[in-house]
């Protein structure tokens, strides 16, 4: 039987390590730091990094990271978005990290900041929930955030050494196409509430 458990972002890895959950499917990047604590499937998604701004804000016409110079910004704590991407913005006023994706979106909506950096699925869902947001996607251009594949490859985490579950998950993932992943992601974005 499948049981879905809602956890805070910082609880995901400990929940897998302790056996509270068998696996985590939550947009986790397969970083070397996380791989020291849990095992990962092959990547099932590559999440491009995007920026959200208000559609009527000062940065709505930005075409590159350079165009965000001086922006007041934030993102979710313990993510590549906050730790690596925000510091790439010249003269950025980086606010403290937010505890969750919903919290960073509220910071943007309330005017505490002019931009948040996140991944494409979160950004797409945010634009549904907040129609006054604009998604800026610099991926594939020279003006994009500099990130490695490790930073954006998304996998399912399992307890270290649980090869039986890891092999079973990889077996299913191996049969899926890029179109399958896109369809599932689009559906998940359409039904995922952006609330705490």
Residue ranges and their predicted role:
Residues 1-196:
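Proline/Glycine/Serine-rich low-complexity intrinsically disordered segments
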